[in-house]
Design a protein with these regions (language model features):
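Structured beta-strand/loop patches that form or line metal/cofactor-binding pockets in enzymes
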Residues: 3-48, 52-53, 402
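Metal- or metallocofactor-binding catalytic centers and their adjacent structured scaffolds
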Residues: 6, 42-119, 351
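Conserved, mostly hydrophobic/aromatic
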Residues: 19, 44, 68, 108, ...
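Metal-dependent enolase-superfamily TIM-barrel catalytic cores that perform enediolate-based chemistry
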Residues: 135-137, 142-254
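C-terminal extensions of enzymes
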Residues: 1, 356-405
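Shared catalytic-loop signature of beta/alpha-barrel
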Residues: 66, 82, 230, 236, ...
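Flexible hinge/switch segments at interdomain interfaces of large molecular machines
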Residues: 128-136
Length: 405
């Protein structure tokens, strides 16, 4: 692991730091439940993290308190890579380094990076992998017009994007079946035609310089995916996301070879092991990494570096709360071939375009997290978060949960 401030991190006083406690509490700050994690040290420095992608956070809480906490007790937070290996090995029989165990590890890893940054008196993006490539991170909004077949609705969407100052958006396809009720992977010609018209309406409304990603939610068989790729080709999409089912298959190579638009996947993939076949076999044009799923900041950096050697740009998938969003942004700043960072604006608190992914007031951030369509850093050490525990406790704890003190 390369850390440019190693002389600070390896000082005699710093090496005496030990992890003394780990606490967690289930919350709902974004649009899904997530587990906030606090890692305490004998130096009085505390790290904050967030475990996401668990429907009620019970699984992640169990793993953090009963598996991870004993592993980290008395350990040196500077041994981050070794500690992540130990956590991954110990939890591997829960799901082979997939699913909730890795979500739990990731939230704790965020907190460890927060501690390292505070000890070095540097923002995380300065000590992760050699420093940042950018001072702010381009965001894209995941949203869509109320009715893509209505030009008026698309015009309203374009005005909203302009007001919030986004230059890119990810837009869901039109489907006859609701996503959660799908019973097959086939798409009718009528659906394909409606999407061709709908996405053309969106393009006409936002103009040629606005990036549009087409979002498919891993729904289609090969034939449907290829027909849809041709249908949306006239709008020159940023990418066509997850057109085939999750997981590597040789059909991804075939689709990428034959598609007239860039193919992307990654939001459901874990660690380098899942990403590697897509990258080395040319099965995609772009990848996106969900930092909360892929294994944390360090693992995601390794994935991005592998992609870079194959000239594959990287974006993020991000449906987590504000804490994990900040952690993800720090990582994104260190990725040279970075395309865009997902921002969710469905919470009314985010409507003005100055925040995203839930109530940013919990961060104690001091500056707007989102400005002119870019994620911002406040220059503070670690993740730059001063968690407003009073606000979280009063408004965002899951019902029946006990506060971590």
């Amino acid at each position: 692991m390369f850390i440019p401030y190693l002389d600070l991190l390896a000082s005699a006083n710093a090496r005496k730091v030990k992890i003394t406690n780990i606490k967690c509490v289930r919350t709902r700050i974004g649009f899904r439940p997530s587990l906030l994690v606090k890692v305490e040290t004998d130096a009085g420095i505390v790290g904050i993290g967030e475990c996401h992608h668990d429907e009620n956070s019970m699984g992640a809480k169990d793993i953090v308190l009963n598996v991870i906490k004993p592993i980290l007790a008395g350990q040196d937070p500077y041994d981050l890579e070794r500690l992540v290996f130990k956590m991954s090995t110990r939890t591997s029989y829960y799901g082979g380094n997939h699913g909730i165990p890795l979500h739990a590890i990731t939230g704790v890893e965020f907190a460890l990076w927060d501690i390292l940054g505070k000890l070095a008196d540097q923002p995380v993006h300065n000590i992760l992998g050699g420093g940042p490539h950018r001072k702010q991170v381009r965001a894209y909004c995941t949203s869509r017009p109320r009715d893509m077949l209505s030009k008026d609705s698309c015009a309203e969407f374009a005005e909203r994007m302009k007001k919030q100052k986004f230059t890119a958006a990810k837009v869901d396809l039109i489907r006859d079946q609701r996503w959660e009720q799908l019973d097959n992977r086939m798409m009718s010609n009528a659906e394909v035609d409606r999407n061709a018209r709908g996405f053309q309406n969106v393009r006409d409304a936002v103009g040629p310089d606005f990036d549009i990603a087409v979002h498919a939610h891993w729904e289609f068989d090969f034939d449907s995916a290829l027909r849809m790729a041709h249908a949306v080709a006239p709008i020159k999409p940023w990418w066509f996301e997850d057109p085939l089912p999750i997981g590597y298959n040789e059909q991804w190579i075939k689709l990428t070879d034959r598609s007239p638009v860039p193919i992307l996947t990654g939001e459901n993939l874990y660690t380098r092991d899942d990403f590697r076949p897509f990258i080395v076999n040319g099965a995609v044009n772009k990848i996106e990494i969900d930092i909360s799923m892929a294994g944390g900041l360090l693992e995601a950096k390794k994935i991005a570096d592998l992609a870079e050697t194959y000239y594959i740009p990287v974006a993020t998938h991000n449906v987590a709360g504000p804490v994990a969003t900040v952690a993800s942004a720090h990582w994104a700043a260190t990725v040279r071939e970075f395309a865009g960072h997902e921002a969710f604006m469905n919470n009314p608190l985010n409507a003005d375009g100055r925040s995203c992914n839930g109530d940013n007031a919990v961060l104690g951030y001091g500056v707007d997290l989102l400005k002119d369509g870019y994620l911002q850093f406040n220059g503070k050490p670690g993740l730059g978060i001063t968690l407003d525990e009073k606000l979280v406790k009063e408004k965002y704890m899951v019902a029946g949960e006990t506060w971590w003190d």
